[in-house]
UniProtKB/Swiss-Prot annotation:
It comes from Caldicellulosiruptor bescii (strain ATCC BAA-1888 / DSM 6725 / KCTC 15123 / Z-1320). Belongs to the imidazoleglycerol-phosphate dehydratase family. InterPro entries: IGPD_sf, ImidazoleglycerolP_deHydtase, ImidazoleglycerP_deHydtase_CS, Ribosomal_Su5_D2-typ_SF. Keywords: Amino-acid biosynthesis, Cytoplasm, Histidine biosynthesis, Lyase. This is Imidazoleglycerol-phosphate dehydratase. CDD domains: IGPD.
Amino acid sequence: MGQRVAEVQRKTKETDIKLILNIDGNGDYKISTGIGFFDHMLQLFSHHGKFDIDLEAKGDIYIDDHHTIEDVGIVLGQAFLKALSDKRGIKRYAHVILPMDEALIMVAVDISGRPYLAFDVDFKLPKLGDMTSQMVVEFFKAFVWSSKTTVHIKKLAGENDHHVCEAIFKAIGRTLKEACTIIDDRIPSSKGVL
């Protein structure tokens, strides 16, 4: 099995993004999006998933954070899809229930080739630091669509929006790491393709 690394670039009139992803990394990261809270969430994702991420994103954040966060989701999803190649040998399915103080988050993943997001999380505040709360779901929509992955994210408990969001990014990192784990040399589908 070769190294599962992907490099993706995306340049539009709104954003300029460069990403290198190593699925079989150590959780090393160099992340810069211009949105501090979002950087922190991606760092947690990298650390808890043990994905090496080198990400530089420049966007029109003088307008708002929408284009940058959504496009990072697109690029990260494309990188996972590219790095996993034909998905030979991966576990494919994984789930985790993760606490962060009073917050409790459930995440389940199927690296199926079929994009679907079930996002059952409410945030009380309009902003998380310098990040718009609504952009959490938009990030995951973009990631799921471009990675062709089914993801369920459900808040089981939680009062503090920061804790809830941290738990989500930690949980998705851990869940994807498990789903990407190599367990044999077969395509994990009765169809023979994902």
